[in-house]
Amino acid sequence: MSQTRKFLVAVGMLAATAGAALAQTYSVGPMKVDQPWARATPGGAKVGGGYLTITNMGATPDRLLGVTLPQAARVEVHEMKMEGGTMQMREVKGGLEIGPGQKVEFKPGGYHIMFMDLRSPFKQGDKLKGQLSFEKAGTVDVEFKVESIGAGAPAAPKHGH
């Protein structure tokens, strides 16, 4: 193998592992939580939104029962959907079931985590430590990275093969 080819292979492997290292992935049992993030909030705001992706890697369903975050007095899982030509937002009561092999994306305009009665504003660049609780898998510690106020989902890292 030529020196140039060896170098390119090494750079490709480094890039692939660096992308994986930058991805925020957390696991508890078969439940995988990817890229938790939140939007920055203006001063005085009492609510904020959190987003992530949950994948059930197991063979049985599980249920997201709740989320906790010290900066919020109350946290709920909400769903937004169109009903009769109007966008409706409601709390998901009783937890959100995630079937075997199912991936659920929490994103603006869909499922999201509603942080309520904020104790302090979320500032871009902050990292908010919280927990997700699943019915069967248990509890997992996560860190929500705070993006800008108008941010969309952060780009997923690209993995080279």
Which residues are covered by each model-predicted region?
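Repetitive helical segments and hydrophobic/amphipathic motifs
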Residues: 14-15
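Sec/Tat signal peptide C-region and signal peptidase I cleavage site
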Residues: 19-23
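Compact, glycine-rich, soluble single-domain proteins
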Residues: 24-161
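Bacterial N-terminal signal peptides that target proteins for export
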Residues: 1-11
